[in-house]
Amino acid sequence: MSIISAEAQKVREALIAKGIETPTVQLTKDKDSRRAEIQQHMRSVLELLGLDLQDDSLEETPHRLAKMYVDEIFSGLDYATFPKITNIENRMKVSEMVLVDDITLTSTCEHHFVTIDGKVAVAYYPKKWVIGLSKINRVVQFFAQRPQVQERFTEQILTAFQTILETDDVAVFVKATHFCVKCRGVKDTNSYTVTSAFGGVFLEDRETRKEFLGLINK
C-alpha cells in the first residue's frame, strides 16, 4: 500500500469536502500490475487502429504508454507522490503578498486525453506559515499530472494552498491552450482559456484582487 503523508491526506479531504476532487475509484492493484494491464489494452487499441506492432518503431509503444500513464503524466492520481512540504513559521512577520508567476502547466484533458499547455500564477498573504517557493510549483505540477478540466484544476490549487498554509488569502490564475480545441474539432490554434479562483482578502477586497491581476499581467 502507498503511504500518504498527513499533509496530502488533509488536502485530499478538503477537496472531497468541497466536491472538487478528481473522480476516481479505489485502486486495488499495484503499479506493476496496472502497467502490465494497460500495456495489454493499449496493444489491442493500436492493433484495432491498424498499426503493425511488429515494426521496430511501434513494438515498444504499448509499454511506453503504460509507463507514461502510471509513472508520469497521471502520477498525480496517487497521493503518495504529493510533494513533501514543511511549513515554516512566519517569524519575519511577512505580511505582503507572496506571488509565484509563470509556473509551467502541462496537463491532460480528461475528455480527449490530449495536452493542456499553459501558465499558472499563485499568490498568498502569509499568516502563521510560509512555504518554500519551489513547493508552490511542485503542488501545481502534482495536480497537473492527472486527467483534468481547467476549472476544477484551478479550484484544486486554491483549496490545496488554503489547506497547507491555513489561510483563506490565496489567489490562483490559469491561462492555457487546450489541444482538444487546437488539434481536433474546431481546430482553433489561437484561442486560450482563462480561469481564476480567489479566497479571503483576494475575494473580498477589490483593490487586492486588482493588485494581483496587475502584477501577473505586466
Swiss-Prot record:
Pathway-wise, it operates in: Cofactor biosynthesis; 7,8-dihydroneopterin triphosphate biosynthesis; 7,8-dihydroneopterin triphosphate from GTP: step 1/1
The GO molecular function terms of this record are: GTP binding; GTP cyclohydrolase I activity; zinc ion binding
Which E.C. number(s) belong to this protein? Answer: 3.5.4.16
Query: Which InterPro entries does the entry link to?
Result: GTP-CH-I_C/QueF (IPR043133), GTP-CH-I_N (IPR043134), GTP_CycHdrlase_I (IPR001474), GTP_CycHdrlase_I_CS (IPR018234), GTP_CycHdrlase_I_dom (IPR020602)
**Which organism is this protein's natural source?**
Actinobacillus pleuropneumoniae serotype 5b (strain L20)
Per its record, how is this protein called by name? GTP cyclohydrolase 1
What Pfam families does the database record attribute to this sequence? GTP_cyclohydroI (PF01227)
Gene3D superfamilies per UniProt: 1.10.286.10, 3.30.1130.10
Family matches, as SUPFAM superfamilies: Tetrahydrobiopterin biosynthesis enzymes-like
Enzyme's top EC category = hydrolase
- Provide the residue positions that the database annotates as binding Zn(2+): 109, 112, 180
One GO location term (cellular component): cytoplasm
Query: Assembly and partners?
Result: Toroid-shaped homodecamer, composed of two pentamers of five dimers.
Catalysed reaction per UniProt? GTP + H2O = 7,8-dihydroneopterin 3'-triphosphate + formate + H(+)
Keywords assigned:
GTP-binding, Hydrolase, Metal-binding, Nucleotide-binding, One-carbon metabolism, Zinc
> Does the entry feature the keyword Membrane, yes or no?
no
Q: Which family does it belong to?
A: Belongs to the GTP cyclohydrolase I family.
Set out the biological process GO terms recorded for this chain's protein.
one-carbon metabolic process; tetrahydrobiopterin biosynthetic process; tetrahydrofolate biosynthetic process
Q: Would you say which domain of life the source belongs to?
A: Bacteria
